[in-house]
């Protein structure tokens, strides 16, 4: 598994860590990414759009604010989000512990 840390990912604040669960040959050209993402308190993954793909998050720890194509809502453990092709999203950690979620990008 490859682990990365990005600064100001997609124009967000602070650091976002990712642990890539599957490598390219395991994704079988059907998915672009399957990863566990960690966002520290006060940090965020900036708003971005998806084209030719969709993305799903499943929250496994912490709490945050999810920007769903311009509409913001709280997310916490057990919540699922879905961003279809042509739409955008972002997420910020609003809690006092790490926000951790699974992220899956499927190719359309």
Which residues does each PLM region occupy?
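A short, N-terminal "cap"/entry segment at the start of jelly-roll beta-barrel domains
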Residues: 1-32, 46
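Conserved short histidine dyad/triad with adjacent acidic residue
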Residues: 20, 35-51, 85
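Short histidine-centered beta-strand/loop micro-motifs
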Residues: 25, 45-50, 92-94
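Short, surface-exposed secondary-structure edge patches
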Residues: 36, 56, 70-74
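Short, conserved beta-strand element in jelly-roll/cupin
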Residues: 38-40, 49-66
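Ligand-binding loop in jelly-roll beta-barrel domains
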Residues: 65, 85-108
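Short acidic-glycine-tyrosine-enriched beta hairpin
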Residues: 71-85
